[in-house]
Amino acid sequence: MIIYATEVQTINSFVRLESLKEVYGFIWIFVPIFSLVLGIITGVLVIVWLEREISAGIQQRIGPEYAGPLGILQALADGTKLLFKEDLRPSRGNTPLFSIGPSIAVISILLSYSIIPFSNHLVLADLNIGIFLWIAISSIAPIGLLMSGYGSNNKYSFLGGLRAAAQSISYEIPLTLCVLSISLLSNSLSTVDIVEAQSKYGFWGWNLWRQPIGFIIFLISSLAECERLPFDLPEAEEELIAGYQTEYSGIKFGLFYVASYLNLLISSLFVTVLYLGGWNISIPHISILKLFEGDQIFGTTIGIFITLAKTYLFLFISIATRWTLPRLRMDQLLNLGWKFLLPISLGNLLLTTSFQLFSL
């Protein structure tokens, strides 16, 4: 009987151990997702603070300085204030569309972060069709903006939603053609493979030098997709009050505010991944894996730092552009997208295809 009781106790301990493994395995699935979301939120807070400080410097004023040291907690204070404001809804609007619109805009942008490699294989989902997934997901956000404009039952909101949809369609196609050119050069649609294809020759191996025309078109299209000046026609204050955001208040207005900065950050990250070598350092024939082969954690940290440094360089350019160039008219914006960027990006794709065929 003693031997039988011991066997039962041993079996029960194994069962408990297996159940604990299942629980820990289930929890471990959410650890990378939680870490990524926490990093994204921190990045957005830093971007908001940087934009306010840079804008203040350009305009020769002080900028935020009371909320935390150097005003770094100002964005957090603004978000807390919006969280506790009343959520108003238009009495004659379409309530389901009005409520769902901001969530669609934010979620579609957040999903794009899952394929960004921040360092060597430090990516949430390394997919073989990662670039196509980003293009597909990014085309969902304008649907949310159009739903918000239509559901508000306001002429300014509806016009803002229509402008957002027209602008997104106009610049999504040139951007996609530029991405296809990069995929042809790298022989892959995976973001990790695209970064590794630029690692051999260091600084001179970046796609920036192999695709200068595509880089400029991608840069312009990214700013237009983010609805940043000079492409902020969907929410032009002088014309449409606040565009599709006119009827929003409280947390829903805050979601649109966060979505614009999330979009700016993801566009900057894709500029880094596609054209600026990603996590790679700029020394030819030296990779982070070989340089920090003995300390993988330190090498990964250096890779993250390099990726973010390149990303914030593009962010600085986009913020400076906001206070440099005037807003375009709607006809000028559409003409730029359809009559200039689309033919040039198509010619760039054909040129890249011809080069790849002749180099075989």
From Swiss-Prot:
Keywords: Chloroplast, Membrane, NAD, NADP, Plastid, Plastoquinone, Quinone, Thylakoid, Translocase, Transmembrane, Transmembrane helix. One of its GO terms (molecular function) is NADH dehydrogenase activity. It is found in: Plastid, Chloroplast thylakoid membrane. It comes from the Eukaryota. Its main location: plastid. Its EC number is 7.1.1.-. The chain crosses the membrane at residues 27-47, 98-118, 129-149, 165-185, 203-223, 253-273, 297-317, 340-360. InterPro entries: NADH_UbQ_OxRdtase_su1/FPO, NADH_UbQ_OxRdtase_su1_CS. It is a multi-pass membrane protein. It catalyses: a plastoquinone + NADH + (n+1) H(+)(in) = a plastoquinol + NAD(+) + n H(+)(out); a plastoquinone + NADPH + (n+1) H(+)(in) = a plastoquinol + NADP(+) + n H(+)(out). The keyword Transit peptide does not apply. The keyword Phosphoprotein does not apply. Pfam families: NADHdh. Belongs to the complex I subunit 1 family. NDH shuttles electrons from NAD(P)H:plastoquinone, via FMN and iron-sulfur (Fe-S) centers, to quinones in the photosynthetic chain and possibly in a chloroplast respiratory chain. The immediate electron acceptor for the enzyme in this species is believed to be plastoquinone. Couples the redox reaction to proton translocation, and thus conserves the redox energy in a proton gradient. NDH is composed of at least 16 different subunits, 5 of which are encoded in the nucleus. This is NAD(P)H-quinone oxidoreductase subunit 1, chloroplastic. It comes from Lobularia maritima.
